[in-house]
Regions:
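Conserved ASCE/P-loop NTPase catalytic core
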Residues: 1-302
Length: 302
């Protein structure tokens, strides 16, 4: 399924995803078949007739098949002797496109499915037939994001037809190969993000049911606690090159302005009081016998 980070503009969806990718880049390298453009799982080399034996011995479930390029190399260069195929280790990298694929939003005139699944190298078509794996250039987001993560940036800004590859990737764990080639196994996490208005517009269209069924939305709200907003500003200031003196309570005042601009008006409390209540403070307004319940304020804002 697709993990969808959905929320208002500036809530931190992209920043959250950047932290996920950074954690992946700092994680341990993975083993994969040398020379494979999708960093193939080495256990895919095991023939299906022997997989049950390997699974019992290793205690793991072997899923998936070799990509067309590795299948060709195994047959042509190693005479189907899978134990001779070299295996190496490599880490994850966004810049080098290793295990992390990013799909930016594109307009309808420039949408090309090769961004997702790669393409055929036209320069090789005069030497090899169309169904020869050597003409494949598996550099799409679902290829480089195999065994890692694929990020769909502002996913619903794309045309719905552009997202059809996501259906097979989530339902069958397979993505189509460019040209006249077999489907390619995909083992990765798909994370998308979008704004609230785009999500509401997308789910309101009944023709999008196939993709909607595969989406798990996670709401990323604004920070409504004053103390947490101050921490965010303090962290950003500490990481910046800004070294000038900052007057006392500057961050608190800026945080108050930000938080109060996000709160909806209510007849139960004035904006400052509501901000204090959301911050966990016990506040009793003048003329009231008991304190205002934060649950009542949240229910009213929904």
């Amino acid at each position: 399924q697709i993990l969808l980070l959905m929320g208002p503009v500036g809530a931190g969806k992209s920043a959250l995803l950047e932290h996920i990718k950074r954690a992946l880049e700092l994680s341990a390298p993975v083993y994969h078949i040398e020379g494979c453009p999708i960093r193939e799982e080495p256990l895919h080399l095991v023939p299906r007739s022997l997989r049950s034996t390997f699974e019992e011995h290793l205690g793991v479930k072997i899923e998936g098949d070799l990509c067309p390029i590795c299948r060709y190399n195994l047959k042509s260069n190693f005479d189907n002797k899978y134990e001779l195929m070299p295996v190496i280790r490599s880490g994850f990298s966004t810049r080098s496109r290793k295990g992390i694929g990013v799909v930016p939003p594109v307009d309808a005139n420039t949408q090309d499915v090769s961004i997702l699944i790669g393409s055929e190298d036209i320069s090789k078509l005069d030497k090899y037939p169309e169904d020869d794996p050597r003409v494949l250039s598996l550099n799409g987001a679902f290829n480089v994001g195999n065994r890692g993560v694929v990020e769909l940036v502002e996913v619903f800004k794309n045309e719905i037809e552009f997202l059809h590859t996501v259906i097979t990737a989530t339902q069958e764990k397979m993505v189509p190969a460019p040209g006249k080639h077999s489907m390619i196994y995909f083992d990765g996490v798909i994370i998308a993000h979008c704004n609230e208005a785009e999500w509401n517009r997308f789910k309101g269209t009944h023709t999008n049911e196939a993709i909607l069924d595969r989406i798990v939305p996670v709401y990323v709200p604004y920070t409504l606690e004053l103390d947490e907003e101050v921490k965010i500003y303090g962290k950003q200031l500490a990481r910046s090159d800004f070294r000038a003196h900052v007057a006392p309570h500057t961050l608190e005042l800026a945080s108050m302005f930000s938080v109060m601009s996000r709160l909806k008006k209510t007849d139960k409390a004035d904006p400052v009081t509501k901000m204090k209540i959301y911050n966990g403070e016990d506040v009793i307004e003048k003329g009231r016998a008991k304190k205002i319940d934060i649950k009542d304020l949240r229910d009213e804002a929904r």
